[in-house]
C-alpha cells in the first residue's frame, strides 16, 4: 500500500517549532545559534520573537546551501569547503527580508498569551522602558518572563500546540471545519516560474 506524504492545507512549515524555541531560549540553551540568557532573569517577548525569526532565517540559509551542495553532487562536483560554505551561507542570509518568514508578532503574542494562561511562563517583575514610550508614554514597558516549574515539566506535545492543550474540546476536527470555510486562492506565478515559449 502506498501512503501519500502530503501536508494538509493551511499552516506553515517550520524547521523547528515556536514552542520548542521559546522553551529552549528561556532555559538559557541558546537554541539554533540564538543568544544565551540567564533563565532566572528571563527575557521579554519582543526579544524572544526577534531571536526566533533570526533563527528561522539561519535555518533557511542553511537549507539553501544544502540544496546547492546536493546539486553539486548530482553534477559530480565536490561539495563546498568550510570557507565556501560560510560565504554561501552569508550570501543567502543577507538576502532574506526580515518579514519573509510568515510568523508575525501578533501571532507570536497570541501564542505567548496561551503559555501565560497555562501557567508555563511568569512575569519576573523586571521591566524596561520601551522605545515606543519616547513618543507614546502610555505604551506598555518591556516585561521579562521566565519559565515556571510547570512549563519546564510540560511534555513536548503540549508545547507544540498550547492552544489545543488549553482548549482540548477544540480538536483537529474543529480546525479542519474552520479551514473548510475559507477560500484559498492560487498565487500568480512569478516571472521565473512562468512557462516560456521555445522562441523566447
PLM region descriptions:
Residues 1-82:
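Short alpha-helical segments that sit at the start of domains
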Residues 14, 18, 100, 104, ...:
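Residue-level marker of regulatory loop/turn positions in helix-turn-helix DNA-binding domains and
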Residues 146-200:
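Amphipathic alpha-helical dimerization/coiled-coil segments
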Residues 33-35, 61, 120, 124, ...:
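Short, solvent-exposed secondary-structure capping/transition elements
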Residues 126-156:
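Short, cationic-aromatic polyanion-contact patches
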Residues 77-106:
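Intrinsically disordered, low-complexity acidic Ser/Thr-rich regulatory segments
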Residues 100-118, 122-125:
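Short amphipathic alpha-helical interaction segments
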Amino acid at each position: 500500500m502506498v501512503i501519500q506524504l502530503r501536508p494538509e492545507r493551511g499552516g506553515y512549515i517550520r524547521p523547528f517549532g515556536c514552542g520548542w524555541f521559546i522553551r529552549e531560549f528561556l532555559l538559557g540553551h541558546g537554541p539554533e545559534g540564538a543568544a544565551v540568557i540567564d533563565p532566572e532573569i528571563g527575557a521579554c517577548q519582543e526579544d524572544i520573537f526577534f531571536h526566533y525569526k533570526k533563527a528561522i532565517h539561519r535555518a533557511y540559509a542553511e537549507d539553501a546551501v544544502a540544496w546547492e551542495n546536493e546539486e553539486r553532487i548530482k553534477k559530480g562536483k565536490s561539495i563546498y569547503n568550510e570557507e565556501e560554505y560560510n560565504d554561501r551561507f552569508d550570501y543567502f542570509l543577507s538576502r532574506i527580508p526580515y518579514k519573509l518568514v510568515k510568523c508575525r508578532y501578533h501571532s507570536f503574542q497570541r501564542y505567548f498569551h496561551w503559555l501565560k494562561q497555562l501557567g508555563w511562563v511568569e512575569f519576573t517583575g523586571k521591566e524596561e522602558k520601551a522605545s515606543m514610550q519616547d513618543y507614546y508614554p502610555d505604551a506598555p514597558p518591556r516585561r521579562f518572563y521566565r519559565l515556571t516549574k510547570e512549563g519546564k515539566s510540560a511534555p513536548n506535545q503540549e508545547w507544540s500546540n498550547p492552544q489545543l492543550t488549553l482548549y482540548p474540546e477544540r480538536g483537529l476536527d474543529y480546525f479542519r471545519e474552520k479551514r473548510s470555510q475559507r477560500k484559498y486562492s492560487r498565487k500568480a506565478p512569478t516571472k521565473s516560474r512562468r512557462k516560456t515559449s521555445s522562441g523566447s
